[in-house]
Design a protein with these regions (language model features):
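Glycine-/small-residue-rich beta-strand-loop submotif within the FAD-binding core of flavoenzymes
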Residues: 195-203, 251-258, 323, 351, ...
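Short conserved micro-motifs at the rims of enzyme active sites and ligand-binding pockets
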Residues: 206-207, 241-242, 407
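Flexible hinge/switch segments at interdomain interfaces of large molecular machines
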Residues: 138-142, 253-259, 328
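Conserved, well-structured core domains of diverse proteins
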Residues: 1-174, 180-190, 195-207, 211-236, ...
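A short alpha-helix capping/helix-coil boundary motif
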Residues: 20-21, 141-145, 262-264, 336, ...
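Short acidic, gly/pro-rich beta-turn/loop elements at beta-sheet edges
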Residues: 158, 205, 240, 308, ...
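Active-site cores of enzymes that catalyze phosphoryl transfer or operate on phosphate-rich substrates
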Residues: 222-277, 281-282, 289, 334
């Protein structure tokens, strides 16, 4: 394991008279190997001086090699090449049709298909929209069945926010702000907004970081804000808070979120304004009143089913119901999540969606409460699948990121 390094001084001597620049190169390589032996941080380099760097180089480019040359077109980790290619083609206005037949194995154990009719009809455009708003909502919202899921300013750039909202305005669908609140870039093109309020109460907090009803009223009464969504948890890291380091809190982000510059921007794991199902519903009623009667609901990734049953029971006891519930699947994405949370915490979308739909149906409230779904929805088949399982509409985040140019490098 040492001979490649030990050969470098011999090669330097052998080439000194013939090619001095080669001798200089081999001498430099000898010094690199000597430093590898003395450094205390990487045992691989101490055991394999000089050649150990090859291991790190190969490890560095492994994801790209695998994605471009080895990965199967249908390997969904997290999105398959075929899924990404479909979004890329449609985002660019290119031909997305395929010839010769499907590449899928129709007889595989995981094969899925839709049942068609022998008498197909042209779809009525009205069927692509739903009305969100319960009996206590004074300003129901006519929403598209496919929308932009929550992604915050700060996680996305100003230009990305602009592009998404411009698309929402052109396509007539809603744009979820994410818990980072409403930035000036969300307002440039006038696309419909769903204002997400997380545990940090960004955009609706006072100087001490407490919930501010006045700030809520100021933001929520804007004509562009169509609904308010309380974030209880997200699929990619349910039960986990978040920290935006002080170094990343720019002047724009600080102004948008209502946080001081030079300090970490912290999202606690849970809300401080409520702690029980009844208090959650009372908070929903309070936000609905502050917004002037706009639809208010919450987003969650299902954990213990009994906790959602508790919320459902509180709806019956108090008579207060959310206008909508968004079920976020554990397969959802985020900028950064601990591996254990991303891989092993939370209920996948299809299971969580069935639980929410069946629970609301069982207690007689399904007709009053609309249900959204988010988690790996990029095609019309993905959308139809969740609609068949009980959802009223679907949201997509990473699908729109692909449309913006995301390459799935997994280095968010």
């Amino acid at each position: 394991r040492y001979w490649p390094w030990l050969s470098t001084p011999l090669l330097a001597l052998a080439t000194l008279a013939w090619q001095p620049w080669l001798a200089l190169l081999f001498s430099a390589l000898f010094l690199v190997g000597l430093n590898d032996l003395r450094q205390p941080h990487r045992s691989v380099l101490r055991n394999y001086p000089l050649t150990g760097h090859l291991r790190f180089a190969l490890e560095y480019i492994r994801p790209e090699i695998r994605q471009y040359f080895i990965e199967d077109d249908e390997a969904e980790y997290p999105f398959s090449r075929n899924q990404r290619a479909l979004v890329y083609a449609r985002a660019k206005g290119q031909n997305d049709k395929r010839g010769f037949g499907s590449l899928k194995n129709m007889y595989s154990p995981n094969a899925e298909w839709l049942l068609h009719s022998n008498r197909p009809r042209h779809a009525d455009p009205k069927t692509f929209r739903i009305t969100i708003g319960g009996p206590n909502c004074r300003h129901p919202y006519s929403a598209s069945i496919f929308n932009i899921s929550a992604m915050s300013f700060g996680a996305l750039s100003a230009n990305a926010i602009r592009a998404l909202n411009k698309g929402a305005a052109a396509g007539g669908f809603m744009h979820d702000t994410g818990e980072g609140s409403i930035s000036p870039y969300h307002r440039e093109f006038g696309g419909d907004l769903v204002w997400e309020i997380g545990s940090g109460y960004f955009g609706c907090r006072d100087a001490e970081g407490r919930f501010s009803p006045e700030r809520v009223q100021e933001q929520a009464t804007s004509a562009q804000v169509k609904m308010i969504e309380i974030k209880l948890s997200q699929g990619a890291k349910p039960g986990h808070g978040g920290v935006l380091p002080a170094a990343k809190v720019s002047e724009e982000i600080a102004a948008t979120r209502g946080v001081p510059m030079g300090q970490d921007c912290i999202s606690p794991a849970s809300h401080s304004e409520f702690s029980t199902p009844t208090e959650l519903l009372q908070f929903i009623a309070r936000l609905r009143e502050l917004s002037g009667g706009k639809p208010v609901g919450f987003k969650l990734c299902i954990g213990h089913p009994t906790e959602f049953f508790g919320i459902a029971k509180a709806m019956l006891e108090t008579g207060i119901t959310p206008d909508f519930i968004v079920v976020d699947g554990a397969e959802g994405g985020t900028g950064a999540a601990p591996a254990e949370f991303a891989d092993h915490v939370g209920m996948p979308l299809r299971d969580g969606l069935r639980l929410v739909h069946n629970t609301l149906f069982a207690i007689g409230l399904r007709q009053r409460i609309k249900v959204g779904a988010s988690g790996k929805i990029v095609s019309s088949f993905d959308l139809l699948r969740v609609l068949a399982l009980g959802a009223d509409w679907g949201n997509s985040a990473r699908g729109f990121m692909f449309a913006l140019g995301c390459l799935q490098s997994l280095s968010c």
